[in-house]
Amino acid sequence: MVKQRRKSRLLPSIQNKLLEQFVAGVSARTAAELTGVNRNTAILFFHKLREIIVEKMAAEAPFLAGEIEVDESYFGGVRKGKRGRGAAGKVPVFGLLKRGGKVYAMMIEDAKAQTLLGIIRDRIQPDSIVYTDSFRSYDVLDVSEFHHVRINHSETFVEEKSHINGIENFWNQAKRHMRRYNGIPKVHFHLFLKECEWRFNHRPARNLLKTLSEWVKV
């Protein structure tokens, strides 16, 4: 059953201005100041935009085939103390990127082998080439239905295709985008993650406003 969304009471001209600010990556608070609307109104409008994006991205979630880069990453949390894999207070996420194509990203409970393998099997066609780094959870791919290529970051020499630069670049873009919000509640993190996925998959930037306007139907 499709969930019905309430029609916005904002004038179409105001909605269009807020859409432009959202696509530009401006925070809701700043957008409120620039458009002259109430701050809470802008916050709610941006929240609804992200909910629409999550719904649409779920509908077009790709089933990937060919050369696929996979990687987990960790977002947020305090900067002090342990960093990287398993860092306390951080949100673990997992991503799959088809080279020259789309990315799929999601929050995960943990980065254990069976967790990651389950997602890979759900989203990647058997016999695809799967590139990973040397994290031990990916060892299960060595005896799977996929062709596993492991990347060793400690080696200075990198073969032309032996890398996961694409998915790492996506993580960098996503973290840079989220950093401007000065902390995202975990309960809403998936909305922002899917926003980053949408921005990547529907680039270049000029297409984002067109796509989102069609989804919102202002």
Locations of the language-model features?
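Residue-level recognition of single "structural anchor" positions
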Residues: 1-218
